[in-house]
Amino acid sequence: MSGLGDSSSDPANPDSHKRKGSPCDTLASSTEKRRREQENKYLEELAELLSANISDIDSLSVKPDKCKILKKTVDQIQLMKRMEQEKSTTDDDVQKSDISSSSQGVIEKESLGPLLLEALDGFFFVVNCEGRIVFVSENVTSYLGYNQEELMNTSVYSILHVGDHAEFVKNLLPKSLVNGVPWPQEATRRNSHTFNCRMLIHPPEDPGTENQEACQRYEVMQCFTVSQPKSIQEDGEDFQSCLICIARRLPRPPAITGVESFMTKQDTTGKIISIDTSSLRAAGRTGWEDLVRKCIYAFFQPQGREPSYARQLFQEVMTRGTASSPSYRFILNDGTMLSAHTKCKLCYPQSPDMQPFIMGIHIIDREHSGLSPQDDSNSGMSIPRINPSVNPGISPAHGVTRSSTLPPSNNNMVSARVNRQQSSDLNSSSSHTNSSNNQGNFGCSPGNQIVANVALNQGQAGSQSSNPSLNLNNSPMEGTGIALSQFMSPRRQANSGLATRARMSNNSFPPNIPTLSSPVGITSGACNNNNRSYSNIPVTSLQGMNEGPNNSVGFSAGSPVLRQMSSQNSPSRLSMQPAKAESKDSKEIASILNEMIQSDNSDNSANEGKPLDSGLLHNNDRLSEGDSKYSQTSHKLVQLLTTTAEQQLRHADIDTSCKDVLSCTGTSSSASSNPSGGTCPSSHSSLTERHKILHRLLQEGSPSDITTLSVEPEKKDSVPASTAVSVSGQSQGSASIKLELDAAKKKESKDHQLLRYLLDKDEKDLRSTPNLCLDDVKVKVEKKEQMDPCNTNPTPMTKPAPEEVKLESQSQFTADLDQFDQLLPTLEKAAQLPSLCETDRMDGAVTGVSIKAEVLPASLQPTTARAAPRLSRLPELELEAIDNQFGQPGAGDQIPWANNTLTTINQNKPEDQCISSQLDELLCPPTTVEGRNDEKALLEQLVSFLSGKDETELAELDRALGIDKLVQGGGLDVLSERFPPQQATPPLMMEDRPTLYSQPYSSPSPTAGLSGPFQGMVRQKPSLGAMPVQVTPPRGTFSPNMGMQPRQTLNRPPAAPNQLRLQLQQRLQGQQQLMHQNRQAILNQFAANAPVGMNMRSGMQQQITPQPPLNAQMLAQRQRELYSQQHRQRQIIQQQRAMLMRHQSFGNNIPPSSGLPVQMGTPRLPQGAPQQFPYPPNYGTNPGTPPASTSPFSQLAANPEASLATRSSMVNRGMAGNMGGQFGAGISPQMQQNVFQYPGPGLVPQGEATFAPSLSPGSSMVPMPVPPPQSSLLQQTPPTSGYQSPDMKAWQQGTMGNNNVFSQAVQSQPAPAQPGVYNNMSITVSMAGGNANIQNMNPMMGQMQMSSLQMPGMNTVCSEQMNDPALRHTGLYCNQLSSTDLLKTDADGNQQVQQVQVFADVQCTVNLVGGDPYLNQPGPLGTQKPTSGPQTPQAQQKSLLQQLLTE
């Protein structure tokens, strides 16, 4: 040892000896070599002895260091010595043997195996390739109960469950045998696998056990197998490839400790209502009471300077619907420190009587105190995500307070969608609103968020995602059905009105709303297309708002507040305060609207075509009846007030989607919204009256009143907000919403004060934000929405056509619309306003490009489909066109356009914002294209200001908006004063006309009898301006579409706004004749172009395409007309003004056709519409109807009113030249197209083709100067072969064909229709625009066998000239000349164009007057005429002419 140690201690010794000895002595070297070998051998033995695990040494590729071995040997010797000493004391033999230096290892192999198996907690067995157990360890008994001998040489499959055989074989056999594919290196590679298998437990050997199988029991074992491909030779036996297995019991899964949690229920103010500790009690832990106390205390304890988690979560929950807190710590009484996190969710109970509440899950984390609540998926309660539809800015308490009242409704989708789209997206883009709305703010400024939230909340109130489609934007609020307005207004909470709005999870409309099935309700739901950003926002947000807390949203006007909110929302109109008021009021309004809609929608649903007439008449009657029925009307007024703005905004969406009832609901929620709509006109007639109603409602404090007030403030707020459609405007809206929420939060009693404050505040905001012009326009449009039927055109005027012209036209139209809306109540009585309003609102719905595609498709899918694509191309123009197509391009579209244009066309917004203070300038739009483009924006601003004028009559709102002066300057009051009396007659006229149209059109399309006629009316509503209607309603295209229920929107009251517009324009003529021209151009574009122009252009014009004569000749004529377009535009604009004035004076009937939209639409159509091809497109748009009937007329059959409206509009527009030649040439090919489109499709009975051809070709072929427009009208009117044989004949052929078609479509009376139409055309020509209504009616009548009617109409106009219908045809020209002479005589003081206008006015009055007899002749018109009770045509003529002349 010592020698070895020496040598090892001196490692260099061996080498040194070697070096020293090797050179001298070989013997010495060999001896040294042997010594080294011996030394190495000893070292190896030492290493083996020292190694506790021989395998470790074997595995070493390099020999261990000698010094280490020796050192360890020394250590080991010392250890052994100590052990020997211990041995002597303990006498441990085993240890002696283990440590014996003579043993091969520290542990004997015999004892190593059992120790290893024990450590493995399993048994060991080896299976050969045949599956036989060649070896099994003895401890198998403790696992399976078998003895070692029992299992040796038995098949392993005997103890394996049959289901595990395949798995075992897979591991036992080489892969090449299992898979049939040779595996490289398989022969030399070890494969180890671990798998689970069931092994049989030894069955009991009880003699009583007969059925061994029944006693079989298997235990799942985990097998670790190693395949030994090489043969093993041991003890002379050759073990071929085998599988070495170790089986052990599966580790027992650790006991799962239940998550400790308890739940709290908080009200919408954040107070804990109840605590559920059942899970804690079930856990059996002691001290759970202390745990709950400490946890809640820590949860509500402020976090340093930060508010408590409870407050933070409450705010987040109220905003987003769900929230989770980070982990917070607390110490129990026993000193144990625990951590917990809380998850909260806003829940809406199914019962409408229950308030919304916040469920909080407090999860205790004893082990991972740092675990964030988000990480903890084991929350006792899964908190449904509530999208943050509620504006985060809204105080959660406010929102929560009313959540329980929110009824679950499928409208959640609408409301959610509306909220999304209510966001500034109205301003930005449709797609943006949806995505941004999905976010907490739904992409809208705080105000808009609130509005959207309100809409969402109201829409989703009762339904926690009960309507999955509602949760399109996945807004937590939406999902939970939370309504921001609920939170915003504690009053809502107390308000059962909302709750009563039946929180039907599947019915977006309150159960008490019978007309939920009515198109209004349906459209309301159907038109919440996410695609519509602005348009959709108004509709859905309005609906969502209405639907949520006000399940009455089923009707589009279900919650005017909501709708208004939605319309306001898009321009940030929904300021926080209005949102709060709306949330409260929306319930109330929802209930009110619900009732109204029950009555009105019942009417609407009962008679889709007639309901609007009856409902609107009823509503108008209520409105006319005044305060005696204000209880009802006040609700409806509340709706109207709340919906006017919303309808304007929504009209884009709702009108399109709710073409029938929705558009009407916009006006009257079908009839119900229209009471508001009608009220709106009446309130328009006296906005001050409407304002009084608001205050009255505030004073009464009724939920619906409050809602109305809230809606109105919201409108106002939205006006500032809409002004701030830009971010700033939205932020203002948000701030106001927050303010309102706070106020509602503080006191429900302050709701009135708050509403008043909001009204004032909105006014102030509007003043302070003149740049919010467009938003103001929206707001005003909202208010005009009451007069929305006519407002639609003004707003559409703000469509893609020249912004300035559009804006100016819009604003002027808005002023006219204000007047018209003043007349609207009467018109609504005529039940035409409702349908027009419906259409208008539907048109308004069309305003949004997205909405058009989404909303329009439902109501006017054919035309709407075209409109939607066109809208994509020409957002503004298309919207306008859609509006007109829907029959109320002027009002609904205008108003929606105010918002939609703002949102869709932000360019207009900024301009409006900048130009809001430039109302006067806006009133005078430039005539140039650039000027018109500027006018587009200016028109939007004007529309906003004119809408403000509506609110001016609501003195506070108008003052706040600074619209008082505008209204006063615009003479809305005068017009309302002048027109209200006329209203009675015009509405009757309108009613007669709808009836006439219903009958004539009923014959061609009995199914659309009312629907079709109302569709016509709806389209005629776009003819608020006579021209716009004609252009606006592509009868062919929209006839089928309008067939849904546009006819309900037959509300011709828009004509009243036309009259108002005419009067307003006449008023402004002196100061702003050029402006009026531009505005009228915009009107034509807007009404004919925007409402109908766009659709007409892409759709309607296509409809007209079927008329090759119109195309070929009109192209040439229109080219010529284009040359003289400026000149003729001025003439036509003046004529239209006169017509508008006449319509204002003499007819609410005519107004739809000769409404502002006509004026504005006519100029605008030329701008935006294709020049020559509009006619064919118009025809193309008519695909829905027989081409032979000049598809417009086919559709006119469906929408006789629309056709008439178109004709009226055409006549009104193209008094001198039926918008084709004169107006078309004067205005533009677009206008001609639109005009002709309408005349072609809509006015063909009047010789639309004739009118258009004669107008376009006649105007162009017989291109007439300013006087020729008059002649042009006359020419167009007599386009019969008698007038101008070549061009006129060609046009007449097309026109006659159209007339025949129209006769066929409307009524198989081609001959009477043609003569009647032509006679009417003559009358119309004579009347220029004035006879438009009669023309419209006469063509319709002629189709309806109205030849005599047409003759009476003509007799009215020029009865003195010619009474013979046959002569009429020929006499048309004479009549025209006589009319022209008469016109000249009447308008001697005026320019020739003005003379034509005066003539048109006179003729329009005559037409109305004559139209009365004319209408009286047909059963429907005659029936309705008594309602109108118009004076004798001549008397009316005189008074109207006097008024017009005085104007």
Curated annotation (Swiss-Prot):
Renumbered ranges of motif LXXLL motif 7: 1441-1445
Domain writeup: The C-terminal (1113-1447) part mediates the histone acetyltransferase (HAT) activity.
Stretches for region Interaction with STAT3: 361-568
Location within or outside the cell: Nucleus
Organism this protein belongs to: Mus musculus (Mouse)
Tissue-level expression: Widely expressed.
Disruption phenotype: Mice show partial hormone resistance: target organs such as uterus, prostate, testis and mammary gland exhibiting decreased growth and development in response to steroid hormones. Moreover, such mice are prone to obesity due to reduced energy expenditure.
Ranges of compositional bias, category Basic and acidic residues: 83-96, 619-628
Superkingdom assignment: Eukaryota
Gene field: Ncoa1
Position of sequence motif LXXLL motif 6: 919-923
Segments of skewed composition (Polar residues): 1-11, 371-381, 401-414, 564-575, 596-607, 701-710
Positions of modified residues (Phosphoserine): 22, 372, 395, 518, 559, 570, 702, 1039, 1191, 1378
Name this polypeptide is given: Nuclear receptor coactivator 1
Sites of N-acetylserine modification: 2
Cellular component terms per the entry's GO annotation: chromatin; cytosol; nucleoplasm; plasma membrane; RNA polymerase II transcription regulator complex; transcription regulator complex
